[in-house]
Amino acid sequence: MGWSWIFLFLLSGTAGVHSEVQLQQSGPELVKPGASVKISCKASGYTFTDYNMHWVKQSHGKSLEWIGYIYPYNGGTGYNQKFKSKATLTVDNSSSTAYMELSSLTSEDSAVYYCAR
């Protein structure tokens, strides 16, 4: 039996009004079912610790789903109950980077993921 694969496409967006605000995400990932993946979102153009970083999922043909947020200043998090056991949000303030780790991946996790300020 051949391997199955899960494709995760990562994009970034921001609600910021200043054009210099940028969020740069890691690239697309192709991973095996059951594996984990950690994706990154590097921020620039604003004070990283001043704003929540949100993560959103969009499966093909479906509406956006909010996964959760992290407040870089103190590491506080809030999760959509649906994703509480799937996603883990962390930050590295020294590099102004937010991370989302997705665990125990299945075909249901194949989607576009966004980070957003």
UniProtKB/Swiss-Prot annotation:
Signal peptide extent:
1-19
What the entry lists under CDD domains is as follows: IgV_H
Q: Which keywords does this chain's UniProt record carry?
A: Adaptive immunity, Immunity, Immunoglobulin, Signal
Classification via InterPro entries: Ig-like_dom, Ig-like_dom_sf, Ig-like_fold, Ig_V-set, IgHV
Q: Tell me what organism the protein belongs to.
A: Mus musculus (Mouse)
The residues that cross the membrane are: none
The record ties this protein, via Pfam families, to: V-set
- Offer a single GO CC term for the protein: extracellular region
Q: Name one GO biological process term.
A: adaptive immune response
Annotated protein name in UniProt: Ig heavy chain V region 108A
Coiled-coil intervals: none
The segment(s) forming the Ig-like domain are 20-117
